[in-house]
């Protein structure tokens, strides 16, 4: 899938030395620590360096918490150093707008580094090169583009939401070598092995929501939660159910205080459907009516809703 990225300013791989690649790789390692944590914010890492030595490092925390640059600068000071005259490696252009937190670019300017090296520019229209411009206006040298592909790979969902208004959707599917997905008598709980299941929970933990259909809920009665992954955050559970036929006793409704459920239906055009919707809503379950022309769930509208109204960047199906 092709995205339209903001043109990079000063992108030239020849301007970087081996140490630059090493420390930006370390910044990317920091960014990977945000995989299960920072949604819907991008996964960002930062390393502050002077004379070939890392003075501090950080990565973006959960929503409302410190961004990578702020974490790294705090780490520098906690380690007894100062950032003035340093080189700062950061995997995403520093934000220049006030959202849930103040602009990171202000923190960087106040730190007075000599050089800031950035992997990728920010596709958020509120930033879109403004962070780089402000750093340059403050007299700080800026370079952009080092290990850009790696930084983009960590942020496919964020890029998709910013450039297309849609989340990045992953489809997990498993089949045997003969093309089967289950035994005919329904006795097969899994056809995948432990490594594949562990991989599946990694993708669950990374997602903002796990989406499935009412047929799967009826047949398998899944919990749709994350297990065996070191994360406090559980993704939303989204059930596509045109006729509101999801059994009220389904396991997917367990632990609603820890992970929410969105039931997406077609038209609420019968008294029974309206009754079911009220019962679910009374339990704290969100019921969303998004009918298409045939009265079923309008999937394009659903993905737009999840991106724009719920700020979701990655969906696992």
Please place each PLM-identified region on the residue numbering.
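Residue-level signal for inorganic ion chemistry
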Residues: 27, 45, 95, 135, ...
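Helical hairpin unit composed of two closely spaced alpha helices linked by a short loop
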Residues: 313-315
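Active-site ligand-binding patch in enzyme domains
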Residues: 160, 168-177, 181-311
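Short beta-strand scaffold segments in enzyme catalytic cores
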Residues: 44-50, 173-174
């Amino acid at each position: 899938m092709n995205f339209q990225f903001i043109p990079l300013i000063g992108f030239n791989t020849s301007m970087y030395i081996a140490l630059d690649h090493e420390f930006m790789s370390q910044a990317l390692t920091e960014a990977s620590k945000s995989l299960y944590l920072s949604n819907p914010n991008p996964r960002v890492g930062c390393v502050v360096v002077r004379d070939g030595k890392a003075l501090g490092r950080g990565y973006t925390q959960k929503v409302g918490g410190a961004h990578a640059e702020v974490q790294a600068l705090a780490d520098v000071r906690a380690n007894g150093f100062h950032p003035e005259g340093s080189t700062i490696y950061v995997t995403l252009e520093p934000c220049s707008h006030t959202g849930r937190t103040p602009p990171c670019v202000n923190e960087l300017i106040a730190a007075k580094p000599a050089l800031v090296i950035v992997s990728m520019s920010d596709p958020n229209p509120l930033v879109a090169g403004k962070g780089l411009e402000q750093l340059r206006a403050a007299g700080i040298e800026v370079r952009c583009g080092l290990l850009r592909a790696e930084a983009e790979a960590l942020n496919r969902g964020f890029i998709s939401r910013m450039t297309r208004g849609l989340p990045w959707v992953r489809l997990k599917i498993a089949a045997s070598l003969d093309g089967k997905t289950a035994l005919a008598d329904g006795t097969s709980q899994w056809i995948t092995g432990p490594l594949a299941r562990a991989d599946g929970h990694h993708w669950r933990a990374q997602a903002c929501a796990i989406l499935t259909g009412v047929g799967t809920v009826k047949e398998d009665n899944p919990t749709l939660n994350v297990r065996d992954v070191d994360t406090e955050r559980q993704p939303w559970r989204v059930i596509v159910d045109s006729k509101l036929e999801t059994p009220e006793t389904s396991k997917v409704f367990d632990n609603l205080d820890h992970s929410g459920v969105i039931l997406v239906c077609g038209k609420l055009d019968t008294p029974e459907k309206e009754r079911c919707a009220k019962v679910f809503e009374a339990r704290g379950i969100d019921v969303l009516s998004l009918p298409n022309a045939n009265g079923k769930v309008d999937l394009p509208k659903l993905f737009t809703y999840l991106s724009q109204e719920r700020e979701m960047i990655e969906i696992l199906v």
